[in-house]
């Protein structure tokens, strides 16, 4: 068991990361540590720049996607992703985040989203395909380079 979370089986998703204590909104839930630099965007890869991808150490790769997540991302001093509570999280609640919060494009999840949320988009997307309303809702809980890429790509279209 890590500090405040552990890996458990979860119905229909295999494994997931669950809180072993409660967390308050804006509290850091998981501290990110970069384990390995990757040469591309693969399943469990975290984008840390325009064409930069890494694998995080620990259980971050086991945190499941949700279209209505309870965690978001904030970069730490090493450039890794800390998972931060968007809202209060209860003890024994599954820790989730939206994969669009860390990757501009996500092309390696071809199947239908199975998050079960009332806000489900029915497919896992990257930031570039996220509805504008959702981007606004996630303000302060996404990797800043995603906003920079939005600006860069929208300027290129003009």
Residue spans for each PLM region:
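Conserved catalytic SET/PR domain of SAM-dependent protein methyltransferases, capturing the structural core
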Residues: 1-158
């Amino acid at each position: 068991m890590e500090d405040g979370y552990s890996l458990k089986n979860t119905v229909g998703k295999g494994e997931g990361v669950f809180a072993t204590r409660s967390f308050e909104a804006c509290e850091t839930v998981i501290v990110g540590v970069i384990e390995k630099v990757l040469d591309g965007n693969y399943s469990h890869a975290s984008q840390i720049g325009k064409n930069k991808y890494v694998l995080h150490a620990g259980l971050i790769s086991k945190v499941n996607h949700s279209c209505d997540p309870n965690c978001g991302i904030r970069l730490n001093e090493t450039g890794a992703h800390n998972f931060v509570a968007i809202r209060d999280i209860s003890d024994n609640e599954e820790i989730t985040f939206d994969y669009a919060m860390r990757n501009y494009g996500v092309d390696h999840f071809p199947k239908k989203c199975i998050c079960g949320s009332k806000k489900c988009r029915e497919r896992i997307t990257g930031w570039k395909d996220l509805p504008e309303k959702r981007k606004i809702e996630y303000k302060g809980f996404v990797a800043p380079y995603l906003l920079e890429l939005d600006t860069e790509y929208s300027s290129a279209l003009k």
